[in-house]
A protein has these predicted regions:
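Eukaryote-biased, non-catalytic alpha-solenoid scaffold regions
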Residues: 2-180
Length: 180
C-alpha cells in the first residue's frame, strides 16, 4: 500500500524535465567503439535511443496535459523543440525520410502540445506569453531555418492568433500579409 501511495503522491513539480531531456541528447552523443571493432571511435549520436527516450517524455507530456499540469507539459514541449534544434545533425536528413522515425514528427508532437496548452482553460496569460517568448528564441536556432524540419514561425503565428483578441489577431494577419 505504501508503494502505491508514494507513487501516486509524487508529482512532476520536483522534476526538471528540461535538464532531463537535454541529458538524453548529451549522453547518447559520447564516443563509443565502432561497429567494425577497429581502433577508431564512433562519435555519432545513437538517434534511435534518443528518440525512444523522447517518446517517453512526450507521452508524459500528454499525460500531464490530461491532468492539467501545464508547467510540466510546457517544459517538455519547449525543451523537445530546443534540444532537437540544438543537436540536429546532417545524418538525420536521411532518417527524416522515414515517416515513423523522424525529428519532424517529434517537433510536430511538441508543437501540437503547445497549441493544446494555449487553448486549455487552466493556462494563464503569463504562461502563454512565456511560451511565445521562448519560441522566439527557439526560432533563432539555425537548424529550423536551414533544414526546414519544423515551421516554428507558423506555430508562433497560430499561438499568437489564438491568444490575441479578435482585433489584434486581424491586425497581425494584415501585418503578415503586407510583409509577404
Amino acid at each position: 500500500k505504501r508503494f502505491i501511495f508514494k507513487e501516486s503522491s509524487s508529482t512532476s513539480k520536483g522534476k526538471d524535465y528540461r535538464t532531463e531531456i537535454q541529458k538524453i541528447f548529451n549522453s547518447f552523443g559520447d564516443s563509443k567503439k565502432s561497429r567494425y571493432h577497429n581502433r577508431y571511435n564512433d562519435y555519432s549520436r545513437d538517434w534511435e535511443t534518443v528518440f525512444n527516450r523522447m517518446d517517453v517524455f512526450l507521452k508524459k507530456a500528454d499525460f500531464f496535459l490530461s491532468l492539467g499540469d501545464m508547467d510540466s507539459t510546457i517544459a517538455i514541449a519547449l525543451q523537445t523543440l530546443r534540444s532537437i534544434g540544438e543537436n540536429y545533425e546532417d545524418e538525420l536528413l536521411y532518417i527524416d525520410d522515414d515517416d515513423d522515425f523522424g525529428t519532424s514528427l517529434y517537433c510536430e508532437h511538441a508543437g501540437g502540445l503547445l497549441m493544446k496548452v494555449v487553448g486549455h482553460p487552466k493556462t494563464t496569460q503569463k504562461q502563454k506569453t512565456d511560451i511565445l517568448q521562448e519560441l522566439r528564441q527557439i526560432a533563432e536556432i539555425s537548424t529550423y531555418r536551414n533544414y526546414g524540419i519544423y515551421d516554428i514561425d507558423e506555430l508562433m503565428m497560430q499561438i499568437n492568433l489564438s491568444i490575441q483578441p479578435t482585433e489584434k489577431a486581424l491586425e497581425l494577419i494584415d501585418g503578415l500579409l503586407e510583409t509577404r
